Regions:
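C-terminal helical/coil "lid" or tail adjacent to the Rossmann-like core of SAM-dependent
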Residues: 116-118
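Active-site nucleotide-donor binding segment shared across nucleotidyl transfer reactions
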Residues: 1-23, 27, 32, 36
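Conserved catalytic core of two-metal-ion nucleotidyltransferases
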Residues: 1, 39-104, 120-200
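A short secondary-structure junction signal
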Residues: 106-112
Length: 200
């Protein structure tokens, strides 16, 4: 289903919002896994599936979002950041967000999201650079601490841990879903079970 800025533009005026530079699509975990299995063989020439772990063989981190990229496009110049990510992020793309189930208990829901934030913070150690200026002081301090810890954990392991955390409740019945591969400041967004299962 359409999501985020793409959904806003579609509902508001039937087009793109001016400040958005990509397309956003959300899947339940089950549908996402099916999509990534068939997409490589079904995407047209010039488009490809880019998983986060495909960049530099999973040794670096940008985020946990899988994308469909349009290879015949360039968005940025040949910058140091683009070279760090092998030029794979220098394209027009479709973000593929994953909806996973959250435990119904307040403590279980909090713990799932908290652990995702910890893994994301540790993964930031494997980015091309860290810009703490965009965070408030407490968040900047915690991000710095986590990124120092992340220096001692291989990024490939963090990718596996994040995937396990995201899907650990997928077989359980629950009333809420969340965006498990989105950035931490949006983990507060949850969706009702009926909305996800009826729409997707």
């Amino acid at each position: 289903m359409l999501d985020s800025g793409t959904l806003l533009g579609a509902v508001r005026h039937g087009g793109f919002i001016p400040w958005d530079d990509d397309v956003d699509v959300a899947f339940t975990r089950e549908n996402f896994e099916k999509f990534v299995q068939v997409a490589p063989g079904e995407l047209p020439e010039g488009m490809s599936l880019l998983r986060p772990e495909d960049i530099l063989e999973g040794r670096v981190f940008y985020d946990f979002t899988t994308r469909v990229i349009y290879e015949n496009s360039r968005v940025h110049g040949d910058t140091e950041q683009m070279r760090f990510y092998e030029g794979k992020l220098n394209h027009l793309w479709v973000d593929l967000f994953v909806l996973d189930r959250l435990p119904d208990s307040r403590s279980g829901s909090w713990l799932s999201k908290f652990l995702q934030k910890i893994v994301y913070g540790m993964a930031m150690a494997h980015r091309d650079r860290l810009d703490f200026g965009k965070y408030s002081l407490p968040i900047g301090v915690h991000s710095g601490e986590l990124s120092v810890m992340g220096c001692f954990v291989p990024m490939r392991l963090l990718f596996r841990v994040q995937r396990w955390l995201a899907g650990k409740d997928s077989r359980k019945k629950s009333s809420r879903w969340y965006y498990s591969n989105y950035q931490p400041d949006y983990l507060y967004v949850t969706l009702a079970d009926a909305w996800c299962t009826n729409c997707l």
